Amino acid sequence: MVIRKYISIITLNVNGLNAPTKRHRLAEWIQKQGPYICCLQETHFRPMDTYRLKLRGWKKIFHANGNQKKAGVAIRISDKIAFKTKAITRDKEGHYIIINGSIQEEDKQL
């Protein structure tokens, strides 16, 4: 694991990820950008659909989804960074998610 002095974060409003082609293109783009953290808005997933967020090299995936196919947010944290999760706060309607944790023993909130 490489230790850097900065954390690269990208955030995207994806306006729905139910189409396989869109998920594939997004995965390729994320891999090309190489961020440590990726925040996604408007995933439009139902709770049962979140398996679609899986991506090689990104084992930590946190999400908040409503019961309908609208809203939805997700935060992916790359395996390249040693993030230790302490607490997660989710909106049951899928509008926000807050993750408290630490990186190299320094507290962070995403």
Q: What kind of region is each of these model predictions?
A:
Residues M1-L110:
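Short phosphate/oxyanion-binding micro-motifs
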